[in-house]
Amino acid sequence: TGLYEAMLEAKDKGMIRHIGITNHRLNVAHEAIESGLYETLQFPFCYLATDKDLELVQDCKKAGMGFIAMKALSGGLINNSAAAYAYLAQFDNVLPIWGVQRESELDEFLSYIDNPPALTPALQAVIDHDREELQGEFCRGCGYCMPCPAGIEINNCARMSLMIRRAPSAAQLTDEMQAKMRKIEECLHCGRCK
């Protein structure tokens, strides 16, 4: 396509230092590792990771490839930043991207630089509870499935029951949000959101 060649040229000119790839599919991620073309892989990774996700992290390490953990808080479903930080700190080849939405959250993560949370039994209990409640196939809110041909806000609607349980529910129960949820009745069953 010429895109990779353009990145190589930019690297040769000193315009960029590294070439990485981002995706959400395990098979594509493994192909990227095996290709040897990329220096980093950006992939969803958090303490809700499956064994296959953990294997991907190890495969990157074996290949000398950096691993950038996106969705480290699972699009807001993980609400204990100390547990998330302590879990990811176990992996010396993983650099998380924290989805900071408020200044207070930024302050929280900045405080971990000087005082990093350790994976204590109490934090492990938080992780175990969240895994029991959340692990498996669920929407992380990335929005890659958008736009929906029926006008459904897939990334919000698919996560609604989880968000009501895990976040302040008032924002999810507005008339506007209820109207957006009713759009589900117009679903075309095209499978784009799978």
Question: Language-model features: where?
Answer:
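Glycine/proline-rich, positively charged
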Residues: 1-68, 73-76
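Structured C-terminal cap/extension of enzyme domains
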Residues: 55-194
